[in-house]
């Protein structure tokens, strides 16, 4: 259960606080998840929260799993660390421990950049994190890699992303291992993410899947091929020496990626 960075509208938070503030101790004891040690103080805390929100008038309320410690932790960081995005820093460190291949996340990121030229800043951060975590389930059984990657990301103790962004990242890693965009296991994330987020996750996951097929996890190979969106086509541009060496799996991965973009897959050689 990940509460960190959970966000609700301020009015919704006030409504919940006012409801709890008028409950009796007996009623609170029957509520699931309410600690018996908090029963006496919970109504007063909710009353204080309601009054605080009435004065501050914020747009939303964001939960912090670190509490007051979050500011202390931040104050102890150097300037260079403060400048880093917390999700990218987390993904970089965790991904290094999970990674099987020598293929650098930066090589994957650079290879994908032309295809995602229209992404916004949030999507750029998620794409960076996804590249670092793209080998997260290599040691799981192939039949369960998509599911395990999805579950791991949903429960990662990672800062720097909202629940919607977490859902998008989890779907991305699921699609990286499996191409079915309607898998039942994705229901929770599909409900959390909006239409743009769902589309972005499917596109990025399919492109990551293609990248690993083309490179085999070896460094330096992705730089020999290019992936481009040209009019109504998703073009995989390969050197003439590779003509005839691309198998059916590569063609299917390209077709799946093109379908995510609503484009026609085309392999161009000798360009």
Model-assigned labels for residue ranges:
Residues 1-218, 223-234, 244, 255:
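Helical "lid/coupling" subdomains associated with nucleotide-phosphate turnover
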Residues 268-271:
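Short proline/glycine- and acidic-rich turn/helix-capping motifs at secondary-structure junctions
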Residues 245-265:
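Short, non-transmembrane amphipathic alpha-helical segments
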Residues 234, 265-266:
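Conserved beta-strand core positions
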């Amino acid at each position: 259960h990940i509460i960190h960075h959970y966000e609700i509208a301020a009015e919704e938070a006030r409504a919940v606080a006012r409801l709890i503030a008028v409950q009796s101790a007996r009623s609170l004891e029957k509520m699931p998840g309410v600690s018996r040690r908090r029963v006496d103080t919970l109504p007063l805390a909710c009353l204080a929260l309601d009054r605080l929100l009435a004065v501050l008038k914020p747009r939303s309320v964001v939960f912090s799993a670190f509490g007051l410690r979050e500011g202390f932790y931040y104050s102890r960081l150097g300037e260079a660390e403060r400048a880093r995005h917390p999700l990218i820093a987390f993904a970089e460190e965790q991904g290094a421990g999970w990674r099987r291949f020598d293929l650098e996340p930066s090589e994957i990121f650079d290879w994908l950049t032309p295809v995602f030229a229209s992404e916004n800043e949030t999507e750029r951060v998620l794409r960076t994190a996804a590249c670092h975590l793209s080998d997260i389930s290599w040691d799981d059984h192939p039949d369960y890699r998509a599911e395990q990657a999805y579950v791991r990301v949903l429960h990662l103790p990672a800062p720097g992303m909202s629940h919607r962004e977490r859902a998008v990242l989890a779907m991305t890693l699921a699609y990286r291992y499996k191409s079915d965009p309607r898998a039942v296991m994705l229901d929770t994330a599909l409900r959390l993410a909006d239409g743009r987020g769902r589309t972005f996750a499917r596109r990025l996951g399919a492109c990551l899947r293609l990248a690993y097929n083309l490179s085999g996890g070896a460094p330096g190979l992705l730089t020999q091929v290019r992936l481009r969106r040209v009019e109504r086509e998703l073009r995989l541009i390969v050197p003439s020496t590779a003509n005839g060496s691309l198998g059916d799996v590569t063609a299917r991965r390209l077709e799946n990626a093109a379908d995510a973009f609503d484009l026609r897959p085309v392999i161009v050689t000798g360009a």
